[in-house]
């Protein structure tokens, strides 16, 4: 079977189990829930604000919700009891001085979630990071060294989930913008070589979700931005760019 046929076959497959979404009430997190629903994949949400989750997702979410903080291990453990995989979409708010710094969320929060997920036996961990995390002189690093903190979180995920029997996927999207998914081609690359670019949150969410069941996405760190205006039936085929 050639690579194209393999990709086509994989589009008929889906993930069996429940996905814990950390950061589900953020703009990207909301789209992750939407795309999980589109793929008929069960999910459980780990959120700081139950009221916001109910506002965004409606009262039917109440049985699929754990309220807690990424800074509190016992609350994370309570959420992980419902999970077979994790999609982590947490991120510090660098524009709000009252919010925890990137070191607490993008580094320590990601590390804590990954460590506890592995202890719980979660086999696959998906992290949404950022373009340019290896560039210490990037202007964004003026805000609490946010890119460096994200890279340190990434490094812990790779360290933990590179062991046999486990796997990870780390997405490094470009600048996040709004809009519906599947309206553009994608550009994937590795090695943090993409200088700049934008991508819809909805497409980041779609790529994160299909990474649950696409073997080509496992044990992969890659950058992604949108390409040409070109409606897509699936984004699976773009993994051929990095495999």
Tell me what each language-model feature is.
Residues 19, 42-112, 116-119, 212-213:
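NAD(P)H-binding glycine-rich loop region in Rossmannoid oxidoreductase-like domains
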Residues 92-190:
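Glycine-/Pro-rich loop/turn segments that contact NAD(P) or position catalytic residues
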Residues 44, 66, 87, 126, ...:
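Hydrophobic/aromatic beta-strand patches that form the interior of the parallel beta-sheet core
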Residues 10-41, 46-47:
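N-terminal Rossmann NAD(P)H-binding glycine-rich loop of SDR-like oxidoreductase domains
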Residues 24, 176-243:
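Active-site-lining helix/loop region of Rossmann-like oxidoreductase modules
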Residues 1-17, 88, 234-243:
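Eukaryotic N-terminal low-complexity, Ser/Thr- and Lys/Arg-rich leader segments
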Residues 23, 47, 129, 172, ...:
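Short beta-strand/turn micro-motifs composed of small residues
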Residues 30, 34-38, 115, 119, ...:
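Short, well-ordered alpha-helices that flank and scaffold nucleotide-derived cofactor binding pockets
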